[in-house]
């Protein structure tokens, strides 16, 4: 219990001491030069909505940022597009908007009859008209920034789909604690998780509603259905994601000692994520296999060793005018250890405490966070907690996360099984 208190205190500290002024997702330094007088003016501006930021490149938007701007002035902006450096510019006396992203060799001109029309063409490029060039930009964002909702960081859909397979395969022990397996019949799992994460000046709050169901079959196997829903808020820009996974927990009997139990859990999963504010949308499918080995070292003490390998691949998705392909294929390897100790009773309820550590690593396409670690603890309050006459184990947990490029965060969890 003391260890869990330390995790909670650390999480509160992270929540209260996050960046006072988090970075804007889209920001730039704007400069204009009058073609007649030669006078130059500069200003900075940022937005957390891709369309609002794009509006800064209309005549009205540039005028609001640079009072000396005219429709024939030269205008240049060194910008950060979700962390990817780029340059957008108008030459003097020209309506053509030029986009340059040196890191991936993109140099694209949008030639409208007016600057406002050129800006419209640039927006269409971002909505999916960019084709292969847009895919290169998205892959660069995943590889070099911590805020893409599809992939590249521990809170992206790709990472969360793999983590969900791993967590349900171990009975939720690495998130909210406690194995919900029973000999037969059906059990529902309901939980809530809040997390706060920071990297490279960006802050992200994560709200997750894990939903699950499992059913014990007569042959000792157990059918698993898992459907978590997640809301991410990064610098005020919101992303919504969800996935559905189906798996089978298969007990393995190979003349193991009575103190050992082993199961293999294959799972298939599909999910999607979208954010109008970020201009991002994507879908993924995955297939995973998890091994879970329990060792009852002594009465009241159990160690669980879990190992997972998963293949995750993006799918093209078109939603609300955004047609986007990330073209990513990655392999996720997740390995963890739980130590669980029965602590006794509290108000007539059986209580156990656990500590865990998990290491996650990716291969395949380049990601901003290729490896991260999670350390946590949880308490399980078991029977005889009852709700509406049903026995309902309750789980409280906390997790600290650290990863590549200074990625760090904290989450707190609450879970029920009934």
Stretch-by-stretch model annotation:
Residues 23-383, 387-417:
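Transmembrane beta-barrel domains of bacterial outer-membrane proteins
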Residues 16-22:
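Sec/Tat signal peptide C-region and signal peptidase I cleavage site
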Residues 1-2:
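N-terminal secretory signal peptides that target proteins for export/translocation
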């Amino acid at each position: 219990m003391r260890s869990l208190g330390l995790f909670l205190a650390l999480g509160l500290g992270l929540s209260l001491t996050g960046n006072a002024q988090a970075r804007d997702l889209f920001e730039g330094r704007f400069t204009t030069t009058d073609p007649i007088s030669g006078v130059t003016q500069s200003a900075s501006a940022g937005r957390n909505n891709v369309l609002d930021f794009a509006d800064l490149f209309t005549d009205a938007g540039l005028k609001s940022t640079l009072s000396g701007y005219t429709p024939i002035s030269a205008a240049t902006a060194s910008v950060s597009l979700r962390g990817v450096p780029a340059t957008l510019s108008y030459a003097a006396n020209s309506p053509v908007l030029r986009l340059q992203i040196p890191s991936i060799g993109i140099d694209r001109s949008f030639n409208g009859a007016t600057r406002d029309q050129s800006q419209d063409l640039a927006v269409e490029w971002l909505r999916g008209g960019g084709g292969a060039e847009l895919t290169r930009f998205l892959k660069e964002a995943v590889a070099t920034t911590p805020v893409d909702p599809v992939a590249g960081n521990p809170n992206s859909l790709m990472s969360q789909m793999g983590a969900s397979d791993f967590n349900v395969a171990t009975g939720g022990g690495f998130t909210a604690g406690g194995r919900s397996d029973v000999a037969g019949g059906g059990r529902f799992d309901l939980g809530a998780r809040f997390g706060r994460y920071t990297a490279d000046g960006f802050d992200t709050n994560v709200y997750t509603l894990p939903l699950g169901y499992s059913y014990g079959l007569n042959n000792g196997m157990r059918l698993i259905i898992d459907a978590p829903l997640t809301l991410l808020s990064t610098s005020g820009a919101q992303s919504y994601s969800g996935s559905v996974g189906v798996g089978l927990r298969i007990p393995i009997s190979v003349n193991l000692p009575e103190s050992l139990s082993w199961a293999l859990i294959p799972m298939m999963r599909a999910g999607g994520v979208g954010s109008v504010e970020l201009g991002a949308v994507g879908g993924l499918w995955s297939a995973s296999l998890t091994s879970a080995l329990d060792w009852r070292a002594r009465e009241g003490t159990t160690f669980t060793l879990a190992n997972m390998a998963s293949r995750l691949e993006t799918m093209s998705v078109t939603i609300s005018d955004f047609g986007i392909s990330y073209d990513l294929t990655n392999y996720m390897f997740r390995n963890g250890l739980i130590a669980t100790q029965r602590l006794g009773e509290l108000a007539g309820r059986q209580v156990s405490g656990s500590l865990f550590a998990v290491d996650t690593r990716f291969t395949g396409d380049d990601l901003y966070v290729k490896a991260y670690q999670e350390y946590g603890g949880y308490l399980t309050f078991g029977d005889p907690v009852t709700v509406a006459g049903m026995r309902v184990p309750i789980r409280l947990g906390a997790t600290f996360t650290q990863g590549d490029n200074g990625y760090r965060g904290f989450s707190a969890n609450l879970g029920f099984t009934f």
